[in-house]
């Protein structure tokens, strides 16, 4: 590839260079085949994510975490969370105009938050609560490895795009205000949603 493209000046669009690379390296037929396959997999992935988010919002609405009237609604004929499906689609349509960095900002932030708390929860649950801190193996599995994981994720936090941090703080602030309203200034317990097998 370095022989074909010694630097990015040869690309018409450096942010979307894959189709150009495939055209020059393998020809138009290969380029079309990969682009069609990529389109199908993106649509399948998007449909699965759309359905998953809609159903999660339904469960949260059903259990009172979100307003039940809207989020807990199920279409009587199709048995789908229709309002949630439409809401997710409307938000997805708003994202069409976003550039790649802005569109991936909340995903990057969400992943880093999740991975950080997964590591911290291992320490909290096993090393502190269950007191699995007697042997060297316990210290290694339930303290050292999760701390290493949290530090590794911490290195990624340092390199996070500024737009991700700003969007994350805004999103977190909205969530905090919503939780304060739902719990009447944190005097009532936070609503929990229940898994139904």
Curated annotation (Swiss-Prot):
Gene Ontology terms describing biological process: amino acid transport
Broad class of where this protein is predominantly found: membrane
Keyword annotations: Amino-acid transport, Cell inner membrane, Cell membrane, Membrane, Symport, Transmembrane, Transmembrane helix, Transport
InterPro entries reported in the protein's UniProt record: AA/rel_permease1 (IPR002293), APC_superfamily (IPR050367)
Pfam families associated with the record: AA_permease_2 (PF13520)
TM region(s), chain numbering: 33-53, 85-105, 107-127, 140-160, 163-183
MF terms (GO), sorted A to Z: symporter activity
Catalytic activity as recorded in UniProt: putrescine(in) + H(+)(in) = putrescine(out) + H(+)(out)
Gene Ontology CC terms: plasma membrane
Signal sequence annotation: none
Annotated membrane topology: Multi-pass membrane protein
Subcellular localization(s) per the UniProt record: Cell inner membrane
Job description of the protein: Putrescine importer.
Assigned protein family: Belongs to the amino acid-polyamine-organocation (APC) superfamily.
Protein's UniProt name: Probable low-affinity putrescine importer PlaP
Organism: Klebsiella pneumoniae
